[in-house]
Amino acid sequence: MNVSPSIISRWGSQHLVVLLTVLLFCWVCPTEAQTFRIDTISDAVFQRMQGKSYPKGCIVSRSELRYLTVSHYDHQGKTHTGELVCNKRIAADLIDIFRSLYKAHYPIERMRLIDDYEADDERSMRANNTSCFCYRAVSGSKKLSKHAQGLAIDINPLYNPYQKGAKVQPANARRYCNRAASFPYKIEKGDLLYRLFVSHGFSWGGSWRSLKDYQHFEK
């Protein structure tokens, strides 16, 4: 870092120390653009959802949903801007949670609308995609899922699978059913992500008795 003699003569030594400190901080700690927004569902977003996460006959109104954009880190420490559609009732909760996760550099690999995977939950989970709203039934039943209301979110699903007996979803996640093993993106009871969701009134599928859904938080 070069500082000209003219600056030294004009500012004096004390001012120069302040200037150098500020410049050094900006060089070492560049400001990262952060995004934590809640928006109504725009025409462009709604068009992406049509016939996919928002199929014909969906009884959840567009006005009940919100589009979120949030900054997050991946396991390599790279920053990304993710997107979610959720129920407006949990939008502020999710923004608070993801802002805290971002500050802590908690890793989330991918966060795209499930419509980018044709609303195919298996495809989305295989890609380790974090998602929220999708108008669909609970796996193996005709009962509407909390996802159908936008009141549930699946986080890092490849590494935090759904397991009921021999059934595992996504199908390529069987190795991650061993919760005693150590691997990236694993959600554990008591970790930061768990504590944040529980403190905002969510329940965790990893605590269920009849099955385990380690990726799943709902309200």
Predicted regions mapped to residue ranges:
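Bacterial N-terminal signal peptides that target proteins for export
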Residues: 3-19
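Bacterial N-terminal signal peptides
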Residues: 17-27
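Sec/Tat signal peptide C-region and signal peptidase I cleavage site
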Residues: 29-33
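N-terminal module-boundary/linker segments of secreted carbohydrate-active enzymes
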Residues: 34-78
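Active-site acidic/histidine clusters and adjacent loop/turn architecture
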Residues: 60-125
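Structured segments of extracytoplasmic/periplasmic soluble domains
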Residues: 73, 93-107, 136, 158-161, ...
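Active-site-adjacent loop/helix surface patches within enzyme catalytic domains
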Residues: 112-147, 160-162
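Catalytic cores and adjacent binding grooves of peptidoglycan-active enzymes
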Residues: 138-140, 144, 150-219
